[in-house]
Regions:
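Amphipathic alpha-helical linker/stalk segments
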Residues: 1-16
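Alpha-helical DNA-contacting segments of helix-turn-helix folds
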Residues: 1-5, 38, 51
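Amphipathic alpha-helical packing segments from all-alpha helical-bundle domains
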Residues: 14-33, 42-69, 76-80, 107-118
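Primarily hydrophobic membrane-targeting regions of prokaryotic envelope proteins
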Residues: 18, 36, 93-95
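Short helix-capping/turn signature of helix-turn-helix
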Residues: 36-41, 85
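Amphipathic C-terminal alpha-helical segment
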Residues: 61, 79-100, 115-120
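Short, well-ordered coil loops that connect the C-terminus of an alpha-helix to the N-terminus
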Residues: 69-72, 100
Length: 120
């Protein structure tokens, strides 16, 4: 599972988003079920914690050019924004709850991430 995510191209927002959406199309329902159980099952909570740490580091690596030149609070805030935009719940909201197509979900994420690029 992580091998597929690790194949995301560094610095290529559209490519990284396509990789991520592909991952969520395949694994998203499973991840959402796990997240729904994390408060009740210790081993699931541990697995989810590992996944959260992995996702943070994936964002730092994959979107490194968007983080270059930022330090301290600004870097943490930008990373947190990227983590939120690329979270499985964001995919679920756009794809499942709001009914966007896969292509429109990808376009929306690319556009939103692009907004962070110009942020101070």
């Amino acid at each position: 599972v992580m091998r597929q995510r690790d194949a995301a191209p560094v610095g290529d927002v559209a490519g990284a988003v396509a990789n991520l959406v592909e991952h969520y199309e395949r694994w998203g329902p499973n991840r959402l079920r796990m997240l729904a159980q994390e408060d009740r099952i210790a081993v699931v909570a541990e697995t989810v914690a590992v996944g959260r740490r992995y996702h943070w580091s994936w964002v730092e690596r994959t979107f490194a050019p968007l983080l270059d030149g930022l330090g301290g609070t600004a870097r943490k805030r930008r990373t947190a924004g990227l983590v939120a935009l690329t979270d499985v719940y964001t995919w679920k909201l756009l794809r499942r709850d709001l009914g966007l197509s896969r292509a429109d979900t990808e376009r929306t994420l690319v556009e939103l991430i692009g907004k962070l690029e110009g942020a101070p």
